[in-house]
Swiss-Prot record:
Belongs to the SorC transcriptional regulatory family. Pfam families: Sugar-bind. Residues 32-55 bind DNA. Gene3D superfamilies: 3.40.50.1360, Winged helix-like DNA-binding domain superfamily/Winged helix DNA-binding domain. This is Transcriptional regulator LsrR. The lineage of its organism: Bacteria, Pseudomonadati, Pseudomonadota, Gammaproteobacteria, Enterobacterales. It comes from Salmonella choleraesuis (strain SC-B67). One of its GO terms (cellular component) is cytoplasm.
Length: 319
C-alpha cells in the first residue's frame, strides 16, 4: 500500500486532494490560483495533481472518487449554512467515529492556525481527542490554549497529553457551581474573569455538540454535570442539543428557565461570536438535529462531521 493511501482517511491524502481540486475546478469554476489559496498548495502542485488525476482515471467527466459524496455534502452544507469551513469524513465501517472526528478536526486546525495564535477549547470527548492529535503541532507552532469553561477534570484527557512547556490558561473554577449566587461570585473573581476575557480574544475555538437524544451517552450527563432527571426535564422543554452546557431548541434558541444555565462558569454561547472561527466537532446520526440547531443559532461557523451524519442533516433540512 502506498504512503499516499496511508496518510489516512481523515487528513488530505493525495487522492482526496485530487478529488477536491477537480471539484473546485470543474464544478465550482475556480481558477488554479484560487484553488491553491483555498487548499494551501502551490499553483504548480494544483496543476500537477489535476494532470495526475486525469492520467490515473480519478478525474473524468465525473469525479471518480470515494470522496465525491463527501464533497457534495460539504458543498451543500457550506452553502446552506454559510459555513467558513467544513470537513465531511468518508464512511468507514467499524471505525471509531470519535477518533476519526478528532483527527479530522486536528487537520482542520493545522490548516488554519498560525504560529503563536490562541486556540480556545470546549470540554467533551471530541475536543479532547482533537487535542491529543494536535499536540505535536501545538508544541512546534507555539499555539497557546485557553479553556472556554470552568472545570479541570473535563479537560485533562486532552491537555494532559500536551508538552509541559505548552501555554495553557485554565479557568480556576468548577464548570458548574452549586448555586446561582456562588456562580456569580466566581465569575467576578479576577482570575476567572481574566481567563474568560482571554478566551473571547481567541483566534479560533473548537467545541463539541451534545444531543439530548443521546440520553445516558451524553458527555454532560456522563461527567455528572446534570442528572437524568434534569436531562428529561430539559428535553421536555424542547431542547435538542447543547454546547458548553447551554441547551438550545431546534431553531438554535437558548431554552429559558434552565437551572444549569445560571450555574455555569465560562463563556456564554453568544460570546462565541467574538471568535473568528468556531469549529463544531460532532458525528453520529443521532446528533444531526443538534448540529443543525447549532448552525442555525450561528454558534459555530465551521464543522467536522462524518458522511452518514452529513447525509442525515441534508435529509432533515430538505423535509
Amino acid at each position: 500500500m502506498s504512503d499516499n493511501t496511508l496518510v489516512s482517511d481523515y487528513g488530505m491524502c493525495e487522492e482526496e486532494q485530487m478529488a477536491r481540486i477537480a471539484w473546485f475546478y470543474y464544478h465550482d469554476g475556480l481558477t488554479q490560483s484560487e484553488i491553491s489559496e483555498r487548499l494551501g498548495l502551490t499553483r504548480l502542485k494544483v496543476s500537477r495533481l489535476l494532470e495526475k488525476g486525469h492520467q490515473s482515471g480519478i478525474i473524468r467527466v465525473q469525479i471518480n472518487s470515494r470522496f465525491e459524496g463527501c464533497l457534495e455534502y460539504e458543498n451543500a452544507l457550506r452553502n446552506h449554512f454559510a459555513l467558513q469551513n467544513i470537513r465531511v469524513l468518508p464512511a468507514l465501517p467499524d471505525a471509531d467515529i470519535g477518533l476519526r472526528l478528532g483527527i479530522g478536526a486536528a487537520h482542520m486546525l493545522m490548516e488554519s492556525l498560525r504560529p503563536q495564535q490562541l486556540l480556545a477549547v470546549g470540554f467533551g470527548e471530541a475536543t479532547m481527542t482533537t487535542l491529543k492529535h494536535l499536540s505535536g503541532f501545538i508544541s512546534a507552532q507555539q499555539i497557546r490554549l485557553v479553556t472556554l469553561s470552568g472545570g479541570v477534570g473535563p479537560y485533562m484527557t486532552g491537555i494532559g497529553q500536551l508538552d509541559a512547556a505548552c501555554s495553557v490558561s485554565i479557568m480556576p473554577a468548577p464548570l458548574r457551581a452549586s448555586s446561582q449566587e456562588i456562580a456569580c461570585t466566581l465569575r467576578n473573581e479576577n482570575s476567572v474573569r481574566d481567563v474568560m476575557l482571554t478566551a473571547q480574544a481567541a483566534d479560533a475555538a473548537i467545541v463539541g455538540i451534545g444531543a439530548i437524544n443521546q440520553k445516558d451517552q451524553a458527555s454532560i450527563l456522563k461527567s455528572g454535570y446534570i442528572t437524568q432527571g434534569e436531562q428529561l426535564m430539559i428535553g421536555r422543554k424542547g431542547a435538542v442539543g447543547d454546547i458548553l452546557g447551554y441547551f438550545f431548541d431546534a431553531h438554535g434558541e437558548i431554552i429559558p428557565g434552565i437551572k444549569i444555565h445560571n450555574e455555569l462558569i465560562g463563556l456564554k454561547l453568544n460570546s462565541l461570536s467574538t471568535i473568528p472561527t468556531v469549529i463544531g466537532v460532532a458525528g453520529g446520526e443521532q446528533k444531526a438535529e443538534a448540529i443543525i440547531a447549532a448552525m442555525r443559532g450561528n454558534y459555530i461557523n465551521a464543522l467536522v462531521t462524518d458522511q452518514k451524519t452529513a447525509g442525515k442533516i441534508i435529509q432533515l433540512i430538505e423535509k
